[in-house]
Amino acid sequence: MFRRYRVSVIIHRSVTRGCYRGWSEGKIDVTTTYDKNHWENVNVWTFDVVCLTRLGVQCRQFDPVSGPFSMNNERKNEGSVYSVGSQNHLVPIRSRKTFFKKKSQISNLLLIILFVLVGALSITVMILAVLYGCKNMMKICDSEDCVRIAASLKESMNESVNPCDDFYQYACGRWPQEHPIPDSSLTNSWFSERSNRMYRKIRDLLMVNISASEVPWAVMQAKTLFTSCMDVYTVNELNLSPMFDLLKLLNLPMIPLVTKKTTNYIEQLASVKKILDLDIFFGFEVIPDPKNKSKNILYLHLPIRSNPFLTDKELEKRLQTIRSRLRKLDELDDEVMLSENEDAELIYMVDVIKYIINNGSDNKCSSDNESIFEDEVLKDFVKEIYNISNLFYDMTRADQNQSISVESLSDSDYMLVDDLQKLTDDYVIDSNLSLTPTPIWRPFIEFIFEGIDKLDLDNKDKVLIGNLEYLKDVALLLACFEEEALGIYVWWTVVDIVVPHASEKLRDIWNKYVSKVTDVEVVGESKSLFCGSIVNKLMGMAVSWMFVDPTFHENKVNKVQEMLEDIREAFGSLVAKTDWMDQLTKTATLKKSHKMEYEIGFPTWLFNEEKLNEYYEGIDLSETRYLANMVQIVQVQLIKTWTSLHDENIFNESYWATDPTDVNAFHTFQLNHITIPAGILQFPFYELGLEALNYGAIGTVLGHELTHGFDTSGRLYDGDGNLRQWWTNKTILEYSDRTQCFIDHYNTYYEVDDYIDGELTLGENIADNGGLREAIVAYKRWKARHGHEPLLPGFTQFTHEQLLFLSFAHLWCESYTATSLKWMMEDSHCPGHVRLQAVLRNSKEFSTAWNCPAGSTMNPSKKCRLW
C-alpha cells in the first residue's frame, strides 16, 4: 500500500523598483513511499518548481544539490526535477503499536525537515529574485547602433574557440572571411577600412558641383586642386614640362651630365629642403626648444624619409621599409631576395631616366645625349645613385638610436654653426688627411632663410644638434664623393617623388615597380580616389569643412570629454596605488596628467570662414597645373615654419596635430596634448550603443594616448612639455626594471620568420597595456554614476565587463599575409593580433571577467604592469 502526501506552498516574490512586479507560484510535491510490513528505502524527495511568470520572463534554474545558478541554459517547457536520495537501512517493525508510534515520529520528523527545506527554498528563491530578477528584466538595447555592433561582433567571432585559449581567434576568427584584403593592399583592418571609406566620401564631396558663393575660398581651392589632378588629358599634354619647371626652381639640371652645371650641391640640398621639405643627407627643422617650448630653435638631426606628395601613408611607410630592408640584405645573406628587389629598383630607375632623357617620347635621343643614353653608361650612372643611397641608409640605421634624450641633452648640444663646422672638419681630416672638408652648415642654413628671415648665426641663433656623430659621418661621406655624383643623387631624389604625379607613362612605370617590390596590385587604382587622397593630404582642413558635421561638437564632444575625464581620473587612481613610485614622482606625474590638454573632433575655428581662408593664405591654384599646385601648397606651409624661428610660441586651440579626417589619434609630447580627430569617432571605434562597448573601443584608444605621456619617450617631458628630468633617480630605476618585463614578454612572440622586437615596440606596448587598464577603471566610474546599462541583443549571456573586452578585441581584428607580417616587424607597433593577445595576457581583469583558469594560455602566472 502506498500513500502520497502533497504540500503546496505559495511564494510571493516582490522585486525592487526598476524590475517587474508579479506573483510566482511554486508547488513542492513531496512523495514518501513505504509498504505496511517494513520500510523500504525512503529514497525520493522531489521538488517540482514551476515558475509562472509575467511579461515573458524566462525562469532560471537553481539546483539545490549542486548549487550553481545557470544563466546560460535555454528555457525548457517541462518541469525541472531535483532529487535528494537516502539509502539508509531501517529496522523492521515488531508490533502494531510500535509501528504506529514509529510512523508518527517519522511523519513528524519528515514534516519538520520538509518545512525547513521549504523555508530554505523560499529564502533562496527570494534572494535569487533580488539578485537576478533585475537582470532577467533588464531592457535589451534595440537601437540601430546596438544592433549594428552586435551583428559585427557576431560575424567576426569564432565561438568554437575557447576564449581562455586564444581570445584573438575567439573574437576575430571569422573577421578575415568577412573583410578580405583588397587587391591594392597586403593587409586589412578596421583602421584601413574606415580610412578608405573616408577617402570615398571625400572623393564624392569633391566631385559635387559647387559655386564660389556657396563655400569658403579655401574650399574652392581644394576643389581646384582636385580638378587639376583629375585632368589626365592636360597632365599628359604637358608631359615632362611641369617636372622640368620644378627642377629649375630647385636649381637642379633637367638631365644630369648633359645640362651645364650652375650651382653646387649644398645650394641644391637647401633648395630641396626650403621648397619641398625633403631631407636627403641630413634632417633640418625649426622646432620648439625642448628645454623651453615658448621659443623656437634650429635643429639638425638624422634625415626623416618622407614624401610630401604621396597619398597612401601605409604604402609610403612600406616602401621605405622595403628599401631599408633591401639595403640590409647584404647582412642577411639572402642573395635571391637581394637580386630580385635590387633588379626591380634598378630597372625602375633606368626606365624613368630613359624616359626623361628621351623627353617623354619614343623618339631616339639627339646626338648630344647619345653617350649617356647608351645602356652601359646609364647602368653605371644608376648604380652610382644606388650605391650612395646604400651608404646613407646604412649610416642612418647605425646612428638612429643615438639621438638626444633627457639623459644626454646638455648645453653643449646647443652650438654655433661655425663651431659645428670645425668639429666636422676636424673629424674629416683625422679620418683621412688627403680629404678636403666641405663647408656645409652655414651655407645650407643661410640659403634656406635667404629672403625669409634675418639670422644671427654668429651669436644669437644657435643650432641644436640631434646626433653629432651622425653629422660627422655625413661630413666625411660628402668629402669622399665628387660634387657631380652628389648632385646626381639630389636630382634623382626629387625625380623619384614626382614620378607618381607626372604623365600616365611615368605613373605606369611607378605602379609596375611598386607592385613588384610590395606584392600589392596598384595598377588598377581609382584615379578619383587617388586625387581625393592627394587633396586630403595637402588641404585637409578645407576638406574637413565639407566632411565634418557642424553640429558634431553639440552631439558628441561632451560624451567624449566625459570619457576622457574618466580615463584621466582612472590613471590618477592607478598611479596613486603604485608601490614603486615615490611620493615626489607620484605628485609630479598626477600634475602632468591634470595639465594634459585635448582637442576633440575639429578645431573650433574650422567653420570660421575668415580663419579657414587665412590658414591657406598665399596659395593661388590653377585647374591646369597639377604638379605646380602641390609644390605651391607645400612651399607656402614651409614658409610659415621658417618665419616662425624668432616668434614666441603660443599654443592654443588653433594647434592641431593632424587633420580632422584622420582615422587615428595623437599625443604631442612637447605640448602635453592629445588630438582626437572626428575621423576616428565613428563605427567601430565609437557610437556603439553601450558605454561598455565605447569604453572598450575608443576608451582604450584615449587611454593609449594619455599613457604615451608616460611611456619611455613621454616621461622625459614634464607637464609643460619641456625636456628635463622631473622623476627621481630611484623611480627611474624602478620604471626601467618594470619596462624590461614588457620587453621580455613581447620578445617571445614569433611571427613568420622572426620574433617581435620588444625594445622597438616598447613605447606602444606600454601605451596599449596602460590604455586598457585605464578604460576598465574608467567604465566602472561611469557605471557608478549612471547605473547598469541594457543588454546587447544576441549577447544577453555576457556581462558588460565581458563586452568591454570583446569590443577591445574587435578593434584589432585584421587580415594579413605572410609578406605583410614581415613589413610589420619593422614597425614600432606590433601586429594587431599580437597587440591584443599580449595586452590581455597581462590583464588580471580580463582573466577574472572570462573565468580563465590560472596557468591557461590567456592567464599566465607572470604578468607585466606599470600602473
Residue spans for each PLM region:
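Helix-loop boundary elements of multi-pass alpha-helical membrane proteins
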Residues: 85-120
